[in-house]
C-alpha cells in the first residue's frame, strides 16, 4: 500500500467517524452549503457573465451569442451549447488539452438541466424558421476546484444567462435581410434550474461535498430542479449504489435547497440592475 493510499484511508476513517457523530470535517450540517457568492456582469466583452464562489470553489461563466442555422431536426428552435474548461491552475488534477471525461460530464449535466427544464426558451430564439436562429454559447471556466463543481457550474450558468443582454434582430420579409440592431434585450430565460449535489460517504448523504469529502465518497448524486416543481436532470457518478429511500430524500432535499439558492441568484441579478 502506497503512502497516498494510507493517507486517504486515514482521511476517510476520520470523515466517517465525524459523520457518525453528526459532524462534517468543516463543521457544516449534513444539508448545509458552503457560503455562496455570485457576481454578474463582470466580463465586459461577453453578453452575459457570472462568477460564482462556492466556498473556495470558483467558476466563471461567459455567454456569447451569434446567428446561425438551426439543427435539421429542430428547425423551429434556437441552438444552445455548453462547454466546460478545467483550467490547470485550478487543480493539480486538471491537464491542458481537449475536454476529459470530467469536463464532458459537467457540461452535459449543466446543459441537460437547462435544456430539459426549458429554462431558455429556444422557440423564442428563432429569427427565420428553418434558416436563421440565435445560437447561445455557455462557456465555463473553472478557476479553483475545492469540491462540488457540478453545483457551482450550474448556478453560474443560469446566473450568466439571466444577466445576458443580446442585440435585437429584425428580419425584413420583403428583402430577406436580417438587421442586427444596437438596442439590446434579455435572453428568453423563463425558469431557474438549480443543481443540488449529494455525496454518499459510508451510508450517509451530505449536500455540497467539499474536495476532501469527494476524495473519500462512495457515490455522487446530482438532482436539478426548477421552481415549477419539475426535475430536469439526475446524474449519478463515482460508482456506489443509492437506495430508493436515499434517492427520495435527495429529491426532497434538492427542491428545498434549490429554492434557497434561487433566491441568492435572483438577489445577485437584482443587485446588478440597481
Curated annotation (Swiss-Prot):
For this record, an example GO cellular component is: cytoplasmic exosome (RNase complex)
Segments forming a coiled coil: none
Q: Cite a single Pfam family from the UniProt record.
A: RNase_PH_C
GO BP: rRNA catabolic process
Q: Which domain of life is it from?
A: Archaea
Cellular localization per UniProt = Cytoplasm
Which SUPFAM superfamilies does this entry report, sorted A to Z? Answer: Ribonuclease PH domain 2-like (SSF55666), Ribosomal protein S5 domain 2-like (SSF54211)
Record key words, sorted: Cytoplasm, Exosome
* Major subcellular location class: cytoplasm
Enumerate the GO terms in the molecular function aspect.
mRNA 3'-UTR AU-rich region binding
Q: Write down the PANTHER family for this protein, in alphabetical order.
A: EXOSOME COMPLEX COMPONENT RRP42, EXOSOME COMPLEX EXONUCLEASE RIBOSOMAL RNA PROCESSING PROTEIN
The entry sums up its family as follows:
Belongs to the RNase PH family. Rrp42 subfamily.
The protein's assembly and partners? Component of the archaeal exosome complex. Forms a hexameric ring-like arrangement composed of 3 Rrp41-Rrp42 heterodimers. The hexameric ring associates with a trimer of Rrp4 and/or Csl4 subunits.
Q: Its function?
A: Non-catalytic component of the exosome, which is a complex involved in RNA degradation. Contributes to the structuring of the Rrp41 active site.
Protein name (database record): Exosome complex component Rrp42
Amino acid at each position: 500500500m502506497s503512502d497516498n493510499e494510507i493517507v486517504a484511508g486515514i482521511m476517510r476513517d476520520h470523515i466517517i467517524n465525524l459523520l457518525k457523530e453528526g459532524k462534517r470535517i468543516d463543521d457544516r450540517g449534513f444539508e448545509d452549503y458552503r457560503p455562496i457568492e455570485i457576481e454578474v456582469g463582470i466580463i465586459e466583452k461577453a453578453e452575459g457573465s457570472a462568477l460564482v464562489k462556492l466556498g473556495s470553489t470558483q467558476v466563471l461563466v461567459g455567454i456569447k451569442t451569434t446567428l446561425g442555422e438551426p439543427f435539421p431536426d429542430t428547425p423551429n428552435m434556437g441552438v444552445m451549447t455548453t462547454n466546460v474548461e478545467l483550467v490547470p491552475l485550478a487543480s493539480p488534477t486538471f491537464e491542458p488539452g481537449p475536454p476529459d471525461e470530467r469536463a464532458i460530464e459537467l457540461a452535459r449535466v449543466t446543459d441537460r438541466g437547462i435544456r430539459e427544464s426549458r429554462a431558455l426558451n429556444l422557440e423564442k430564439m428563432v429569427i427565420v424558421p428553418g434558416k436563421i436562429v440565435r445560437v447561445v454559447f455557455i462557456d465555463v471556466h473553472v478557476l479553483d476546484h475545492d469540491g462540488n463543481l457540478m453545483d457551482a457550474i450550474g448556478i453560474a450558468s443560469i446566473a450568466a444567462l439571466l444577466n445576458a443582454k443580446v442585440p435585437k434582430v429584425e428580419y425584413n420579409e420583403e428583402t430577406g435581410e436580417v438587421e442586427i440592431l444596437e438596442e439590446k434585450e434579455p435572453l428568453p430565460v423563463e425558469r431557474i434550474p438549480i443543481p443540488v449535489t449529494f455525496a454518499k460517504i459510508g451510508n450517509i448523504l451530505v449536500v455540497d461535498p467539499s474536495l476532501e469529502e469527494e476524495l473519500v465518497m462512495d457515490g455522487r448524486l446530482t438532482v436539478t430542479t426548477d421552481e415549477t416543481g419539475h426535475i430536469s436532470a439526475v446524474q449519478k457518478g463515482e460508482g456506489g449504489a443509492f437506495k430508493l429511500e436515499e434517492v427520495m430524500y435527495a429529491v426532497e432535499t434538492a427542491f428545498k435547497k434549490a429554492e434557497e439558492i434561487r433566491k441568492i441568484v435572483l438577489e445577485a441579478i437584482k443587485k446588478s440592475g440597481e
